[in-house]
């Protein structure tokens, strides 16, 4: 019998998750179906309940419902509790298990696919929203030399630094405080690239040894990556690899099989080109 999975969001028509999971299933010999589920704001619980009642086995959650999924789950992993957000729900034995695979997806893309160790590196993350909250704990697990969050509203960055202090030291600053400082890894976790804009970074943050990573994926260079390229950053990467890696972790949670990701990432980049 084919097991049913889906991704739920609003909007959802743009999601590449069905393509990714169908390729994972084909490669690992798993019998699943995977679809997109649209939910009106305020109807997340109703739509999920209907999905479970129809025999659904698991859900991926995208914007704007990761907080709803966190509250919906009856059992949470440590990384989901740290993020206070869930992107993977599993329905088993009458319970709802919540996990967050965003951070491990980012770390695997950087460390394994890009072959750029995080341990001992100076890491800068731009933004202080949900995207940052979802990845801080796995990054801190890698033991960077330092981890700095920069945000227009410093108090939001400070709140995150305080929340994650039990996992490691996190510095919170405004963008102006980055003047005269450089970093080994700079991660853009703001939504500026979606609006064809750029965070207000001072010059000098990037060096020829810097990995510039935009969590948004694009067919061309985002404004953030264009800026990094113009300042001679050593390596540029968008978030497509993270998307595939977080999906692979979800797939492994559901199916007990760890799919190979590089081929799927390359296929997806061709599809999006």
Swiss-Prot record:
Task: List the InterPro entries.
Answer: Aminoacid_DH-like_N_sf, NAD(P)-bd_dom_sf, SDH_C, Shikimate_DH, Shikimate_DH-bd_N, Shikimate_DH_fam, Shikm_DH/Glu-tRNA_Rdtase
Quaternary structure per UniProt? Homodimer.
Q: Where does NADP(+) bind?
A: 78, 127-131, 151-156, 215, 239
Gene Ontology CC terms, in alphabetical order? cytosol
Which NCBIfam families does this one have?
Answer: aroE, PRK00258.1-2
What is the protein's name according to its record? Answer: Shikimate dehydrogenase (NADP(+))
Q: Is Transcription tagged as a keyword?
A: no
Q: Which residues form the active site?
A: 66
Pfam families with a match to the protein in the record: SDH_C, Shikimate_DH, Shikimate_dh_N
The chemistry this enzyme catalyses reads: shikimate + NADP(+) = 3-dehydroshikimate + NADPH + H(+)
- Fetch the SUPFAM superfamilies from UniProt: Aminoacid dehydrogenase-like, N-terminal domain (SSF53223), NAD(P)-binding Rossmann-fold domains (SSF51735)
Q: Which GO terms describe its molecular function?
A: NADP binding; shikimate 3-dehydrogenase (NADP+) activity
Organism in which the protein naturally occurs: Chromobacterium violaceum (strain ATCC 12472 / DSM 30191 / JCM 1249 / CCUG 213 / NBRC 12614 / NCIMB 9131 / NCTC 9757 / MK)
User: Which residues are noted in the entry as shikimate-binding?
Assistant: 15-17, 62, 87, 102, 217
GO BP: amino acid biosynthetic process; aromatic amino acid family biosynthetic process; chorismate biosynthetic process; shikimate metabolic process
| Pathway(s) of this molecule | Metabolic intermediate biosynthesis; chorismate biosynthesis; chorismate from D-erythrose 4-phosphate and phosphoenolpyruvate: step 4/7
What family name appears in the similarity comment? Belongs to the shikimate dehydrogenase family.
